[in-house]
UniProtKB/Swiss-Prot annotation:
Pfam families: WD40. This is DNA damage-binding protein 2. Expressed in bone marrow, liver, lung, muscle, pancreas and spleen. InterPro entries: DDB2 (IPR033312), WD40/YVTN_repeat-like_dom_sf (IPR015943), WD40_repeat_CS (IPR019775), WD40_repeat_dom_sf (IPR036322), WD40_rpt (IPR001680). One of its GO terms (biological process) is cellular response to UV. Pathway: Protein modification; protein ubiquitination. Residues 1-31 are annotated as: Disordered. It comes from Mus musculus (Mouse). Residues 68-79, 87-98 are annotated as: Required for interaction with DDB1.
């Protein structure tokens, strides 16, 4: 069956776009001019083009509230509305609320770009962020206390994966280019080292953990994937890909199901109970370009993949051989940019991803904005674009917290928190 392709230029009338004024921000908060991409052409022409594009985005309609959520719940209780229609109503209401989302917290604690991001599983205002220098910040932006900052080794210490320990949420797992996968506490103590390459030529690029099965899985730059128990026992170590394993993901509902994504242009699906060698995968999903990420949906029924060029795919567990949707979207690879990865919303059937406009694409318009794009997971249609002129860089990582009401984005050195917030509590946290 031919996959349904959704051009990224195809926008629904029901699209909400967030545009924020720079007037609230002081000159010291704006992105340094040296970091901005140079644009050829007269200033007057550039200003005109940008204003026209902003005006076009502003004219897009915001989804209207079709009915009361309370009424929808009541109709469902009476059996007059299906669960699917109730979910659609809740999603539409959430999309309407996105129109009022804004950056209300900001931090820039690192001297190198951010490389990884993880939300705390039980504290909706707490997240961990890692940097290219190996630094890790544990930040509860809901309180005024200073964040926990764990200093890394600097060059060569890039944090490639972060996961909180669900069995002890004052601990976290981390994989790094330093050549280790480890368990640490918030004081910086290393409690256990799961893998150590002891070589500068081998490092670990990806990480996932299952609290239910008590296993840790990590992938390295040589194509190996290692499965360990949380007490440190190695269960197996196999070369599953020809090149770097950029991402590993355990299915949240069936944690014996593993997805691995590689720059060898494949994503593979594995059954951990039946792995006997590199050829014992259940499915191999070929891509046209190297793959940055493969993420299971919260219900475990679908898989979202992001390549290193301009394609996002959605696969269904009922039909692995062909993607349900191909979404054309610019997010090309660049050496000094943290790879862009699309993620699922934690509650709704939505996909969130940062945009890196590509002038080589026919769909690219002059001075296209670096927005955060939100797509419908079923149709592949763009539903919303978030943009703040005060934070105009490329957001490589974007993830909603477990409650689904707050979005964290990383943009170069910066960490941005988007949410609905009253003006009286809007405060920017500068360098911490």
């Amino acid at each position: 069956m031919a996959p349904k392709k959704c051009p990224e230029t195809q926008k629904s009338p029901d699209v909400a776009v967030l545009l924020r004024s720079k007037s609230r921000r002081g000159p010291q908060e704006l992105e340094p001019e040296a970091k901005k991409l140079r644009v050829q052409g007269p200033v007057s022409s550039r200003t005109c083009e940008s204003c026209c594009l902003l005006a076009e985005l502003s004219s897009l309609q915001i989804p209207s509230r079709s009915s009361s959520i309370v009424r929808d719940l009541y109709q469902h209780k009476l059996g007059k509305a299906t669960w699917s229609s109730l979910q659609q109503g809740l999603q539409k209401s959430f999309l309407h609320s996105l129109a009022s989302y804004q950056v209300f917290r900001k931090a820039a604690p690192f001297d190198r770009r951010t490389t990884s991001l993880a939300w705390h599983p039980t504290h909706p205002s707490t997240l961990a962020v890692g940097s290219k220098g190996g630094d890790i910040m544990i930040w509860n932006f809901g309180i005024k206390d200073k964040p926990i900052f764990l200093k890394g080794i600097g060059a060569g210490g890039s944090i490639t994966g972060l996961k909180f320990n669900h069995l002890n949420t004052n601990q976290f797992f981390a994989s790094s280019m330093e050549g280790t996968t480890r368990l640490q506490d918030f004081k910086g103590n290393i409690l256990r080292v799961y893998t150590s390459s002891n070589s500068c030529k081998v490092w670990f690029c990806s990480l996932d953990v299952s609290a239910k099965s008590r296993v840790v899985v990590t992938g390295d730059n040589m194509g190996h994937v290692i499965l360990l128990s949380t007490d440190g026992k190695e269960l197996w170590n196999l070369r599953m890909h020809k090149k770097k394993v950029a991402h590993v993901a355990l299915n949240p509902c069936c944690d014996w199901l593993l997805a691995t994504a590689s720059i060898d242009q494949t994503v593979k699906i594995w059954d951990l109970r039946q792995i006997k060698g590199k050829d014992s995968f259940l499915y191999s999903l070929p891509h046209r370009h190297p793959v940055n990420a493969a993420c299971f949906s919260p219900d475990g029924a679908r898989l979202l993949t992001t390549d290193q060029n301009n394609e996002i795919r959605v696969y269904s567990a009922s039909q692995w051989d062909s993607p349900l949707n191909l979404i054309s979207h610019p997010h090309r690879h660049f050496q000094h940019l943290t790879p862009i990865k699309a993620t699922w919303h934690s509650r709704h059937n939505l996909i969130v991803v940062g945009r890196y406009p590509d002038p080589n694409l026919k769909s690219c318009v002059p001075y296209e904005l670096r927005t955060i794009d939100v797509f419908d997971g079923s149709s592949g249609k763009m539903m919303c674009q978030l943009y703040d002129p005060g934070y105009s860089g490329i957001t490589s990582l974007n993830e909603f917290n477990p409650m689904g009401d707050t979005l964290a984005s990383t943009m170069g050195y910066h960490i941005l928190i988007w949410s609905q917030e009253e003006d009286g509590s809007q405060k920017d946290h500068e360098r911490l």
